[in-house]
């Protein structure tokens, strides 16, 4: 990944942080943004993803957001896909998605909770995933579950497991991120 792209991603993350801090009042609702890194593995593809999301938290339990990011798919295991030639190198892709998260707060400490969520969107690849095919748009549905731990006022850390469905590289992985 080029230096210019890294600078753009960091700039977007800082902008989202400042925007959500300026829009949020004292209540636990309003605009919220997050930056998340995930690592996913399927039987035949490994991928890494860095995404940023901006959305609205309706209350302490429900969040709906719109996000985008960048991801990298590594080559796949040809033994599991015998009809396709081996791809080497990295495929760059750019996911755009709608994100919904439902938090279940712990009874003793309402600031921390268990989260369930889903993300539906489309991923655009800079070249076809498989050499024998010509599509570059790949719909995806990502299911996630994990924990949301408040560190300070509205700043928190989220982490957990995710599973891809409805996309070519189906698989499971983990995610970690910050929300503010």
Language-model regions, residue ranges each:
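Gram-negative (and chloroplast) outer-membrane scaffold detector with strong preference
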Residues: 37-41, 53-131, 138, 149-155, ...
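Transmembrane beta-barrel architecture of outer-membrane proteins
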Residues: 32, 47-49, 93-97, 138-142, ...
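Surface-exposed extracellular loop regions of Gram-negative outer-membrane beta-barrel proteins
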Residues: 145-147
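Cleavable N-terminal export/targeting peptides
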Residues: 1-29
């Amino acid at each position: 990944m080029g230096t210019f792209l890294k600078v753009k991603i960091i700039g977007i993350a800082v902008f989202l942080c400042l925007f959500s801090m300026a829009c949020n009042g004292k209540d636990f609702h309003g605009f919220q943004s997050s930056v998340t890194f995930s690592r996913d593995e399927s039987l035949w593809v490994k991928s890494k993803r860095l995404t940023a999301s901006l959305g609205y938290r309706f209350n302490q339990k429900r969040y709906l957001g719109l996000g985008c990011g960048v991801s990298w798919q590594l080559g796949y295991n040809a033994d599991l896909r015998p009809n396709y030639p081996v791809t080497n190198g990295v495929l760059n892709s750019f996911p755009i998605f709608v994100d919904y998260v439902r938090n279940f707060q712990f009874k003793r400490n309402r600031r921390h909770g268990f989260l369930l969520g889903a993300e539906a969107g489309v991923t655009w690849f800079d070249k076809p995933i498989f050499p024998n095919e010509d599509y570059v748009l790949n719909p995806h549905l990502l299911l996630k579950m994990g924990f949301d731990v408040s560190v300070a006022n509205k700043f928190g850390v989220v982490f957990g497991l995710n599973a891809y469905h409805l996309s070519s590289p189906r698989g499971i992985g983990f995610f970690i991120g910050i929300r503010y």
